[in-house]
Amino acid sequence: MSFSEDQAMEEAKLRNDETEEQDPVVRTYPVFFSPGLRNNLLLNQFPLRPKNRTYSDANGEAPIDVRVKPKTGWMEVDVPIPTTKYYNEDKAMKYGNGKKPIQTQTLSGRLQKPRTNLMVGLIRDGQFHIVPLRGLTQLRPSMKHVNEYTQKLKAAAGPSNSSSGTSTPRGPIRAVQVTAKQNTEAPKVSTTHIVRATEEEEWVELDCRPERESESILKQLECPIEHQPNECAAVDEDYSFI
């Protein structure tokens, strides 16, 4: 080993010592993988929602219904529409069912698997309990009510020409041949099968519980004493949202 290499190693060691002195380790915790919610914990994000206006009981907008399509990975959440500010009763009646105004809006998003190993952690009684996230989703307001209203209008109107009984005069029919050069090297990308699979899959309703039960969810983040020496088997039947 040359003198320059020895000098470089010595300088690196001095820098590490200085870093440890500036940012010392003040406490260590034993780490446990909690089995209670493993593979069942989802993180919901609301990119268009201000931090001070959460969908919660305090703001009168706690989620009412939650449903998912497990295979295609779609999620919908129904939340109340606040009527104290910026509420248009005419529009609400327009997009309602015809008898009463619309009272909820639907948030939708696609469930995604985390690209990194995201986890939720809880420090309690000098122990660090962690649970891996099964997935995350970004929920945004959807235009579901507008689409339903548009479809209702189309269904009521029926075929444009057959309903009136009149026909539009047409010019002479001419044959037009259109040819397109086929690129055999380009990859064939089609989303038709994805759309069809999404439409055919049935929604699975989930149990939506009030915020006051969140403490029980936090309790499940803790690894029970009897399972702390060894990991427990996972359960894949329930979802929990944070």
Curated annotation (Swiss-Prot):
Coiled-coil positions: none
GO MF annotations in UniProt: DNA-directed RNA polymerase activity
Function recorded in the entry: DNA-dependent RNA polymerase catalyzes the transcription of DNA into RNA using the four ribonucleoside triphosphates as substrates. Specific peripheric component of RNA polymerase III which synthesizes small RNAs, such as 5S rRNA and tRNAs. The RPC53/RPC4-RPC37/RPC5 subcomplex is required for terminator recognition and reinitiation.
Keyword check for Nucleus: yes
Protein name as catalogued: DNA-directed RNA polymerase III subunit rpc5
Originating gene: rpc37
Localization in the cell: Cytoplasm; Nucleus
Compositionally biased residues, Low complexity: 155-172
Assembly and interaction partners: Component of the RNA polymerase III (Pol III) complex consisting of 17 subunits.
GO biological process: transcription by RNA polymerase III
Entry keywords, A to Z: Cytoplasm, DNA-directed RNA polymerase, Nucleus, Transcription
Nucleus as UniProt keyword: yes
GO cellular component: chromatin; cytosol; nucleus; RNA polymerase III complex
Annotated stretches, region: Disordered: 1-22, 153-172
